[in-house]
Amino acid sequence: IFALLIALVMGLGAAIYFSIFIALMGVLLALTPIAAQLYGADRYAEIGEEVRQSAWLAVALGAACFALLRYPDPFMALTRLPPEVEERARGYLWAASWGVPAALLFRVFYGFSTAVSRPRVVMALNLIGLAIKIPLNMVFMYGQLGAPELGGVGCAVSSSVIAWVSCLLAWSWCFLAPGYRRYHVFARWSWPDARRLAHI
């Protein structure tokens, strides 16, 4: 019964989460062709500005997704689930919401790196995340190493942790790696530019 409850919570929570997340993530995919065009034209310094604006967009979309996942009443009203399952599904979405801003910022790095022909970095980070995901699931789902036993909610907790780890590693690499310096991502501060954001 416990295993069935975990499956129900994860299935419902993941369905709601990915429905919202993928819709918002699709907006950020526009960075890749924009940056790739600038890369092909050797206009490297301009790529940094596009990345900074995309990061602002990711923050805004992340805030919207964060709010939707923490107040999922419209979605729950459609499910008509037993109260116990609904409560746990809300817990799953609450835990997952913490990782959304980091996951979207990582997608900006993903699109940027892909555009400038550096996909290996992204692949390496994804593999690191996958390697961490399995033991973290065991820790949070089944209460290992002194952690509370969270069941399906623990899967969302581990996903949020990995999202932040991946995001921090990605942008630290972008800051430190010599191969990224010519794009001037960290050369200066940029406030949101409505014209550029509309273009993205």
Q: Which positions does each model-derived feature cover?
A:
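Small-residue-rich hydrophobic transmembrane alpha-helices
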Residues: 9-66, 70, 103-122
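Small-residue hotspots at the loop-to-helix junctions and early N-terminal turns
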Residues: 2-15, 89-93, 156
